[in-house]
Amino acid sequence: MEYFDMRKMSVNLWRNAAGETREICTFPPAKRDFYWRASIASIAANGEFSLFPGMERIVTLLEGGEMLLESADRFNHTLKPFQPFAFAADQVVKAKLTAGQMSMDFNIMTRLDVCKAKVRIAERTFTTFGSRGGVVFVINGAWQLGDKLLTTDQGACWFDGRHTLRLLQPQGKLLFSEINWLAGHSPDQVQ
C-alpha cells in the first residue's frame, strides 16, 4: 500500500503549457511501458490529450467547469463532475473548457490487451472487490483505510488484496478505481 497527498506530489508541466500532471502510481512501478497508470491532471487551457497507443483512458472531472471532449466523428461528450468517461487513448481527443476556468481530473489508463479499470464514486463505507490493483482519492470527508486516516486530496494505491474504506463522518465522497487483469495475464508475471 502506498499513500499520497496531492498537495505534496511533484508536478510535471505539459509541453504545450496547457496543464500539468501529478502521477499517483504506475504498474509495474517506475516503468515507462506501464500496464496501468493513475494520475491527476490540472487543465488550464483547451488542447489535446496525449496519445497512448493500445491504452484505454478513463477520465473523471474532480473540480472546475465542465469539459467538452471531442474526437472527430467518434464522440462529443460533456464531462461532468464525478462521472467517469472511458475512451481509447490512441485517438485524438480535444478538451475544451466550457466555463473558461481551470479543471482538475483523475485519469487512469490501462493496456487494453492486459487489464481493465473500473472507476466509481463512493459515499459510504465499502470493501474493494479483491482486485489486483487500485487507487482511492478522497474528494471530501474523512475515511479510514487500515490504520491510516485519509482526508481531502489524500489517497492510496495498492497492487493486491481487499481493502475496507470506512467513512468516519455523516457525509463524504471518494473516487476509487480497481484494476482487473484479463485472462492469461497476471501482475505476478511482470514484477
UniProtKB/Swiss-Prot annotation:
Keywords attached to this entry: Stress response
InterPro entries linked: RmlC-like_jellyroll, RmlC_Cupin_sf, Uncharacterised_HutD/Ves, Uncharacterised_Ves
GO BP: cellular response to cold
Induction per the UniProt record: Induced by various environmental stresses, including low temperature, osmotic shock and oxygen. Expression is induced more than 10 fold by reducing temperature from 37 to 25 degrees Celsius.
Pfam families, sorted: HutD
Alphabetical list of CDD domains matching this protein: cupin_HutD_N
Domain of life of the organism encoding this protein: Bacteria
Entry keyword annotation includes Acetylation: no
Membrane-spanning segments: none
Cysteine disulfide links: none
Listed NCBIfam families: PRK11396.1 (NF008488)
Recorded family membership: Belongs to the Ves family.
The name this protein goes by in its record: Protein Ves
